[in-house]
A protein has these predicted regions:
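Long, low-complexity, Gly/Thr
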Residues: 1-186
Length: 186
């Protein structure tokens, strides 16, 4: 069942065939997101099967009828910024603690997703600087630590910066730029 803003729809093919968790052992529908013209539906490969580590995205029309599919994608392909599926489904496919593909870095907490911000409310993304990108985040208790890595070929190559945040994803303190060796011992 797909829950839309105005109704609930049954996921089905154009010939009327419907799907449920019992349809196959190799994948399950794990998320659906309403779009302007229907739904995007995420199928995740089941652990221990040939589809483990793979995902498939169906697009449907406004009645829940499948109109197209992505083909099977690896977790890396699914999380790539070009596809934007991490952001679309709010899932961390590569387990780096970040939700990629949106207009700002998002941190995956144990119970919610938080936008990384500075004290004035400004947000950051891969487009914020050509010198660095956030590459990982880790929840520490109710707070986060976010790793920024210097971009290859820039003055920050080989350097890293670790930002600590509060429980809402607001940056509270930073490590300063550390070499790779200093980061390992941090």
């Amino acid at each position: 069942q797909l829950s839309g803003s105005s109704d609930i729809y049954t996921l089905r093919k154009s010939d009327g065939q419907t799907y449920s968790d019992d349809s196959t052992d190799i994948w399950d529908v794990t998320a659906a997101k309403e779009t302007g013209s229907g739904f995007d539906v995420l199928l995740e490969g089941s652990d221990g099967t040939i589809r483990e580590g793979y995902n498939f995205i169906w697009s449907t029309n406004s009645s829940g009828v499948i109109t197209s599919g992505s083909g099977w994608l690896t977790d890396a392909q699914t999380e790539s910024d070009a596809n934007g599926y991490e952001n679309r489904f709010g899932k961390d496919f590569n387990n780096d603690g970040l939700i990629s593909g949106g207009s700002a870095y998002q941190l995956l907490g144990s119970s919610d997703i938080y936008t990384l911000k500075d004290g004035s409310g400004a947000t950051y993304s891969d487009d914020s600087s050509s010198l660095w990108d956030a590459t990982a985040a880790k929840q520490t208790g109710s707070n986060f630590e976010v790793l920024f890595e210097g971009t290859d070929g820039t003055s920050k190559e080989g350097y890293n910066y670790i930002w600590s945040t509060n429980s809402s994803g607001v940056m509270t303190s930073g490590s300063g730029w550390l070499t790779d060796a200093q980061t390992e011992s941090h």
